[in-house]
Every structure is written in C-alpha cells, then in structure tokens.
C-alpha cells in the first residue's frame, strides 16, 4: 500500500470537514490542500491558497480515512458451513481456525498474495487508508514466516499471531515454546507487533504471559485478543504488559474497566501529551456474527478509556472489511455518538497502532486525523455530513479516497 505524488491538490466547498484532531474540530464550508503525501493546509474555502489541481467537493463531507487496526487478511478458503451452523444455534469456539490454517497452507505464495491484495483493495474502496493485518493461519515456522512476509508487502502494519490456536496434535507447552522461539525469530524481519489469543480453548494466562514476554524482549509492540468469550485474564495481561491494545473486550468486569481507565490517567486527551494507555478495540461486526454481546463501548468511553473500532476481517467470525458498518453499529447499537464512532474508527485506530502523532515515526506520518503535516488520508462521502453513515445504514457512501496524497478511489 504505497504511492507517491508531488503535485498539490486543493479541495474546496467541503460541507463538513471532520478533522478528528486534538481540538475535535468540525469545519463547515472548508477546504484542504494536499502536497505530496502530506496535508499542507486546511481552513475555510474563502481563505484557500492556490494549488496545481482544484477539486470542488460540492458540499460533501470529508473525514480522515478509516484506520483499521485489527484484521486477519492472510488466509485462503472460507467457513460458510461454520457460519450457517452458528446461525442455526451452535455456539462459537476457536476451533474453526484449524480449517482456515489447512486452506491457507495449501495455496501458493502467488495465490495467497492475490487474495490479500484483493481484500486490501476492497477495504480501500470503502474508505480504509491504513490497515493492520495479523498472521495466525500458518501456525508453523515456515507458514507464519510466509504469512508475515506477504502481509508486509501489502499492508501498513503486520502483527505476529502465531499464538492464535494450538494446532491439532500439538502439545500446548511445546507449541508455546515454538511461538516464543524459532517462529518468533522467523517472523521478526516482517512484523512490528505481536498478539496472543488469551481465551479458553486457545492460550492460558501463563502461556499468554510467556508469549508477551518473549515478544517484548524481541522489541515488538504488544497486542492482546482478550475477554471475547467470557471474563478472563486478557485485559489484566494487557495492562500488566502495557500493551498498545486489547481487542474484543466483550465481557468486562468493573475491575477490568477500572484497570483500563487507569492506564490513561497520565495522558491528556486535549493535547495527546503524557503516557498513553491501552486502547480497548471493539469489533462489532464480529460480535454480531458470533452473537456475542456487543463490547461496552459507551461504558469504556465514560470511564475515560480510549477505544478503537476495527472490522476484524477474517473468514470465521467477521468476513467484512466495512468500517462504515462498524461505525453504524456503534451508533445504533453501542450508543456512541456519530463523532465518537468516527473518531474510534480513525484516530482511535491510529492510537492503537501508535501512529496518531508526529510527522515521522519510523518513516510514517501521523494518520487518523486531518492536520497540517499529517499524512493526507482523506475519505470523501457521497453525503453532506458523517451523520449519514448511521442515518442511512447499509448505503455505500464512499465517494472518493486519497491515500498518502494519491487519489485511489
């Protein structure tokens, strides 16, 4: 997902420019200038400077591009039979991961690359401009390394998820040793993050702690799948290891909420200054597909926890890349305001990936908000305001998309 462009572009007559900057500005009759890959200026249309190219937004809304901080794009096959069984009343368990692992191992590098590339294109066509993807359907050294290498060529952020499930026939402790040793070494050149599925039927608290400790010692940022199927140790582990995010968070005790809120006590939401805490990443499309309770996004926000929304595209529990669907669900079912939901799907995702601030972090500009110096990732709607995302559920409202200053839709 890379492109360059050195010309300047001026977009005027923006009906609503939802910046998602630290001031939460929403500008009316606005304009924005893109130079190369960065935002060079934004303000009122009447004050707009000249540029090489001029685009009239005709009153449409412009948002930051979606930042999808949780997906599983490196896979082959599907699990429609599992979905149908679940809709008929069977409960979700993590066992279907093994089905996808077999299908993924069976395809060539070229075919797996094509599949990932097609999924990225689908996401971009709906306004996603920054994408994370995990490994986790290889589950041996060779195939996890292959998944990481392919993902690194196609998405913005790669997360190592060898600790997704213990493969059939493997000893859990021996497999955890593999995840913490040779498999970790094999993926390191391609990944920035490590994750663990800390849940019944997957990895125990002690096994998860070993995985997180090994990944931290290897210099990787940390993420946790936790509290999806019931209350458990996932949130506490994420807090203990200062993980960037804990994802799913469907079942939270009061203690879990307080612990997450405590990680944000030293961070100023008005300026972004101070020590960041652990983001709670909500995955509403997954919750609907698995018929789990929706994550308590409203409660988390009210407690002072920063949240993200992500699509969790995967073949078993959330086969969608539609961030707009997640925003709609957050507004209609999770009781977030439109502004809160859009912020969680843009700035919140950037926060969960450590890409929310600074103009040069590992060679990447800040994403998830619209401000001078940030990467020019824009999502223009076929509507005058972001409210239409929830007001008109299911309607494809993406009009135009710019990624790193290049118009891609």
Swiss-Prot record:
Name a GO molecular-function annotation: iron ion binding
UniProt: N-formimidoyl-L-glutamate binding residues: 137, 314, 316
Q: Which cofactor does it need?
A: Zn(2+); Fe(3+)
Q: Which UniProt keywords apply?
A: Cytoplasm, Histidine metabolism, Hydrolase, Iron, Metal-binding, Zinc
Instruction: Name the catalysed reactions.
Output: 4-imidazolone-5-propanoate + H2O = N-formimidoyl-L-glutamate
The positions annotated for binding Fe(3+) are 70, 72, 225
Q: Where is the signal peptide?
A: none
- The protein's organism comes out as Paenarthrobacter aurescens (strain TC1)
Q: GO biological process: any one?
A: L-histidine catabolic process to glutamate and formate
**Underlying gene:** hutI
Q: What is this protein called?
A: Imidazolonepropionase
Q: Indicate which residues the UniProt annotation says bind Zn(2+).
A: 70, 72, 225
GO cellular component labels: cytoplasm
What is known about what this protein does?
A: Catalyzes the hydrolytic cleavage of the carbon-nitrogen bond in imidazolone-5-propanoate to yield N-formimidoyl-L-glutamate. It is the third step in the universal histidine degradation pathway.
Q: State its location(s).
A: Cytoplasm
Q: How is the cofactor bound?
A: Binds 1 zinc or iron ion per subunit.
Concerning its family, UniProt says:
Belongs to the metallo-dependent hydrolases superfamily. HutI family.
What EC number(s) does its UniProt record assign? 3.5.2.7
Superkingdom assignment: Bacteria
